[in-house]
């Protein structure tokens, strides 16, 4: 689409979310009038005169949320008096995170902390089947979290895949 738009004289821009430019964006950069980047030093991949440092897009709900920690923890059915660890692998999930939790269920169950595990849609059925009849009370399992502002607010610690969007959100929320 960008190639066609450029041929038609329509101004185009691309957005590179990562600190290392992908092959596609490096190729598309030739057609783009501007290249929005999240990090300094992107001149090694793109012409400096085309670069605009915009940062990565983040969910507006993270900025506008007013939920308090106790309310956020309770929204997951957990105890506000206990520490909470949020484990997220993105919307598709992260097999290594899910497998680690499943391999250490005894540690999870005997822990003084509580856990929210976002499995991702792909792994959810497998995880819930594995947990049938043996899910620890301090472990909440969900395929997807629609209110990430509440999830982040509830968490004392986040264990996550290192995606560009996730890292940008962590920088925003602290």
Regions picked out by a protein language model, each given a short descriptive name:
Residues 1, 94-100, 162, 166-169:
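Short glycine/serine/threonine-rich phosphate/pyrophosphate-binding segments
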Residues 3, 25-26, 106, 168:
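Alpha-helical segments flanking ligand/cofactor-binding loops in enzyme cores
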Residues 6-70, 78:
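Active-site-proximal region of nucleotide-activated glycan assembly enzymes
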Residues 26-29, 41-50, 126-134, 151, ...:
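Short loop/helix-cap segments at secondary-structure boundaries that form the rim of catalytic
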Residues 67-74, 78-157:
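Donor-nucleotide binding loops and adjacent catalytic segments primarily
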Residues 148-174:
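A donor-sugar binding/catalytic signature common to diverse glycosyltransferases
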